[in-house]
């Protein structure tokens, strides 16, 4: 049951959509209520024996819930009244609004008794639960699953919830209370700790490394370790060690100096020997070159002297071997010189500088290329968006019906409902359909997480009159009977509501804008019924909604 934005709280069968504070007289039939006075038999369904919900009366005078009477008609070819076994004729079944008003005004106890001792009329029961201080509510803090009464929620959020956030006393960051101790001891950079060397000083975690570099209790090697001193002691004791072991340190330095001088002397001798050998090899090479020229002259005069050629070849091989030996000696000399020469290091530094310059130039080129890539990506995204719009438009045109009936396939139900719960896309529209080729243009609008009084508990379904190309030729206001349906994919229990437009409502006048204000049912079907696995309203994450317009007495242009 829903109420109009213009209705000011008076009940009616079908009313205009109200996204604000709508007033509703209805109740959830699946709840077991505790009535203040014993429930009279005339208020019980003749089929399910529970309190009547949207009562319908048959020709034999018995009353049934709307859902029950539909079930009897769908499950049986010839429905029989379970009380008097009379045949139930469809044309004799009607809504018993008088009984409905009486049922909705029956008093029931709040289910949160004994904490709450309120007595409310059945039609206002859900509204009472929305305000009842003893109603269990969900804590708004993520991961908190503790049940909380509405009256205790404020204190729970501010003082007792283990998943509320509080500022760390040291780094001032917001931290979940249950993680606060672990944050302080292991993660907080500003948490004060004792020096690990037990110097009794309290320092911040971020300053530990800096403190250890000067801590008097830190273990440190003697500065003369390079010269052979093996002493390791606390920093505060090393100065005393340096004074007391001064003579020993001087002896170690002198011994090291003597060793270095001996090594330098040996290197000089080795270099002199290598230079002498290089000189000898150079003279041998000159001699061989001279012999080579002589053999070349002989070979030029007479090429038939094979022995001379063989000797010449052997000399060539010997010359190549000598050149290799000279090359090895030169490498050894260079290695010895490099130990006392910084030129290779300077050359390496110059090479690194050149590579750094090259990398900087590459960075500039990469920045230019990245900017161009971003521009191309922007253009591509614009084209993709336009293609998506065109594709959506073609789909709508292909699926348009002109017989006053719409079958709306809603796919990805879970994802779209989650978007509605998060507030990203609270409602979705169907493709438009027409009563004829030149008839009224219409569509449906659904709130998967509910709208108005159905928010959070029901799927809300509305009927929308849209602006069409032939509106100036049509009769206004729109007067045709409309039926909204949720199709059972097993073909057994379709849920439907039918209403006749109010000619005085602006929802059915000729549209001034793209569409009129929607009209329909904010509590069309409860989530508990829609999403129940025993029912077949949702299969493969898809549901089907149907809107049918009665075309009787409607003139076709």
Swiss-Prot record:
Chain intervals annotated as zinc finger (TRAF-type): 127-181, 182-239
SUPFAM superfamilies on file: RING/U-box (SSF57850), TRAF domain-like (SSF49599)
Domain annotation MATH: ranges: 403-549
Cellular compartments annotated: Cytoplasm; Cytoplasm, Cytosol
Chain ranges of zinc fingers (RING-type): 45-85
Tissues of expression: Expressed in spleen, thymus, prostate, testis, ovary, small intestine, colon, and peripheral blood.
Keywords from the named record: Apoptosis, Coiled coil, Cytoplasm, Isopeptide bond, Metal-binding, Repeat, Ubl conjugation, Zinc, Zinc-finger
Gene Ontology CC terms, in alphabetical order: CD40 receptor complex; centrosome; cytoplasm; cytoplasmic side of plasma membrane; cytosol
CDD domains: mRING-HC-C3HC3D_TRAF5
UniProt-annotated stretches for the region Interaction with EIF2AK2/PKR: 345-557
Crosslink feature (Glycyl lysine isopeptide (Lys-Gly) (interchain with G-Cter in ubiquitin)) location: 318
GO molecular function, one term: ubiquitin protein ligase activity
Pfam families found in the cross-reference section: TRAF-mep_MATH, TRAF3_RING, zf-TRAF
GO biological process: apoptotic process; CD40 signaling pathway; cell surface receptor signaling pathway; interleukin-17-mediated signaling pathway; mRNA stabilization; positive regulation of canonical NF-kappaB signal transduction; positive regulation of cell population proliferation; positive regulation of NF-kappaB transcription factor activity
The protein's assembly and partners: Homotrimer. Heteromer with TRAF3. Associates with TNFRSF5/CD40 through interaction with TRAF3. Associates with LTBR/TNFRSF3, TNFRSF4, TNFRSF8/CD30, TNFRSF11A/RANK, TNFRSF13B/TACI, TNFRSF14, TNFRSF17, TNFRSF19/TROY, RIPK2, MAP3K14, MAP3K5, and TRAF and TNF receptor associated protein TDP2. Interacts (via C-terminus) with EIF2AK2/PKR (via the kinase catalytic domain).
Function: Adapter protein and signal transducer that links members of the tumor necrosis factor receptor family to different signaling pathways by association with the receptor cytoplasmic domain and kinases. Mediates activation of NF-kappa-B and probably JNK. Seems to be involved in apoptosis. Plays a role in mediating activation of NF-kappa-B by EIF2AK2/PKR.
Written domain comment of the UniProt record: The MATH/TRAF domain binds to receptor cytoplasmic domains.
Family membership noted in the UniProt record: Belongs to the TNF receptor-associated factor family. A subfamily.
Protein name, entry field: TNF receptor-associated factor 5
Native species: Homo sapiens (Human)
